[in-house]
Curated annotation (Swiss-Prot):
Protein name, as recorded: Peptide chain release factor 1
PROSITE patterns xref list: RF_PROK_I
Modified residues (N5-methylglutamine): 234
Keywords: Cytoplasm, Methylation, Protein biosynthesis
UniProt entry tagged with the keyword Cytoplasm: yes
Length: 357
């Protein structure tokens, strides 16, 4: 099955090369760009295939030599080389399997992250702030740019909700598996008896969708303006600069009050709405795809409990891949890769099986 899919993918290269020779194709920039992207992707697979075939050939040659070799010292050298070649073969197979997975067209997109406090009152809001800080520190390590779109702060400095954007290379690809319920176990600063409390916050990672990528009918929108308010309901603006947009067909409501001008708040609210509508349509497609197999692991379902942060034990556990690390302090300082890398590999392995690769 693996080799069949590999050969099937690389066999399309010649057909695409013929398409690219069509002079009329350049006139349609959108179509041309799409074909170039597919060609680059298939070329990447083909390069790995050539490398893989070379390794297979070397393995076969070494096995043949080993059968004929009489000297024990040479036999040991050949055996060691075969071990090294087998390791390279396994690594290449894994790389090729990743490339053969159905491509997520959003992997190269920037993202909008929404963090909302869940069960746990003020402690949940403080944890939402901790998660926001964690993603900001991770973004700084990756040299990504961040911008707050909207937030609703509590009196103790927590967030009932915060929405922010991250821009950079492969942002969605790296963080798309963060969607879900994040649970925290710790003694809250608000707890005088020193009892351990469990709280939660919900994270949604949405690809940033351009205006040209989704059609939104102005007639389907109800736009309300109101005065923006700060923590505890204090008014921070004397003009009606805050904007609330309701998408009537779906009932999706977005709001923004972070900017000083109504126009900018509307632009930011529309940015969130595009991302939410895209997610709404995409989730419907996912349900259809998975209707014949109850498998939604790593799907980005925001109701799925994905991770527990246990502060007294300095422990972080990801429930989707049964990964546990005792490096919670470093993790909260933005060192996410020691968990994200093995998590991504595990979730991809699960996808290999479900896609029969």
């Amino acid at each position: 099955m693996f080799l069949e899919k590999l050969n099937s993918a690389t066999s399309k290269i010649k057909l695409i090369e013929e398409k690219l020779q069509d002079i009329n194709l350049i006139k349609n920039q959108k179509k041309y760009s799409k074909i170039i992207k597919e060609y680059t992707y298939l070329e990447k697979i083909n390069t790995k295939k050539i490398e893989y075939e070379k390794i297979l050939s070397q393995i076969n040659d070494n096995k043949t030599i080993l059968e004929k070799e009489d000297q024990q010292e040479m036999k040991e050298l050949i055996k060691q080389e075969l071990i090294d070649l087998d390791k390279k073969k396994e690594d290449l197979e894994h790389q090729i399997k990743i490339l053969l997975l159905p491509q997520d067209e959003n992997d190269s997109k920037n993202i909008i992250i929404e963090i909302r406090a869940g069960t746990g009152g003020e402690e949940a809001a403080l944890f939402a702030n901790n998660l926001y800080s964690m993603y900001i520190k991770y973004s700084e390590r990756k040299k990504w740019k961040t911008e707050i779109i909207n937030f609703n702060e509590t009196e103790l400095g927590g967030f009932k909700e915060i929405v922010f954007e991250i821009k950079g290379k492969d942002v969605f690809k790296k963080l798309k598996y963060e969607s879900g319920v994040h649970r925290v176990q710790r003694i809250p600063i608000t707890e005088s008896n020193g009892r351990l409390q469990t709280s939660a916050a919900t994270v949604a990672v949405l690809p940033n969708i351009e205006e040209t990528e989704i059609d939104i009918n102005e007639k389907d929108l109800r736009i309300d303006v109101y005065r923006s308010s700060g923590a505890g309901g204090q008014h921070v603006n004397t003009t009606d600069s805050a904007v609330r947009i309701t998408h009537l067909p779906t009932g999706i409501v977005v709001q923004c009050q972070n900017e000083r001008s109504q126009h900018k708040n509307k632009d930011q609210a529309m940015k969130i709405l595009r991302a939410r509508l895209y997610e709404f349509e995409d989730s419907k497609k996912q349900e259809q795809r998975s209707s014949n197999r109850k498998q939604q692991v790593g799907s980005g379902d925001r109701s799925e409990r994905i991770r527990t942060y246990n502060f007294p034990q300095n422990r972080i556990t990801d429930h989707r891949a049964n990964i546990t690390l005792y490096k919670l302090e470093e993790f909260m300082q933005g060192e996410l890769d020691p968990l994200l890398d093995p998590l991504t590999i595990e979730l991809q392995e699960q996808k290999f099986k479900s896609n029969n690769i």
